[in-house]
């Protein structure tokens, strides 16, 4: 038979896992300068509707927007965020974009 403490620890871990999954949603944030919607403001993905993420906007805050299927990063030289496309690191001033002809992601100039 399990001890009462072991069962409580397992229950706590299950609840913590469920909460963590609710606060992060799949997908990537679009480029900050392409998010013109400044409201509603948010702090975490769990505050947004089912298909939206909490992402930086051009107003300097974060708001709920439709998630992007690809990682666009911010693509600017000197940023701390590297941008990768299909496992390849994009250069400075490049972002990851889906090419409709080849049906693949590729690095393009911003």
UniProtKB/Swiss-Prot annotation:
GO cellular component: extracellular region
Record bears the keyword Methyltransferase: no
Disulphide-bonded residues: 29-55, 38-59, 42-54, 48-64
Tissue-wise expression: Expressed by the venom gland.
Keyword terms: Antibiotic, Antimicrobial, Disulfide bond, Fungicide, Protease inhibitor, Secreted, Serine protease inhibitor, Signal
Main location as per UniProt: secreted
InterPro entries in alphabetical order: Elafin-like_sf, WAP_dom
Signal sequence segment: 1-20
Recorded GO MF terms: peptidase inhibitor activity; serine-type endopeptidase inhibitor activity
Annotated Gene3D superfamilies: Elafin-like
Keyword Protease in record: no
All copies of domain WAP, residue ranges: 22-68
Any one of the GO BP annotations: venom-mediated disruption of cell wall in another organism
Further comment found in the protein's record: Negative results: does not inhibit plasmin and thrombin. Does not show any hemolytic activity on mouse erythorcytes.
Biological role: Antimicrobial peptides with activity against Gram-positive and Gram-negative bacteria as well as fungi. Recognizes carbohydrates in the microbial cell walls, and induces structural damage to them. Also inhibits microbial serine proteases subtilisin A and proteinase K, as well as human and porcine elastases. Carbohydrates that are recognized are LPS, mannan, peptidoglycan, and N-acetl-D-glucosamine.
Protein family (similarity comment): Belongs to the venom waprin family. Cys-rich waprin subfamily.
The protein's name: Waprin-Thr1
Organism the protein comes from: Apis mellifera (Honeybee)
Lineage: Eukaryota, Metazoa, Ecdysozoa, Arthropoda, Hexapoda
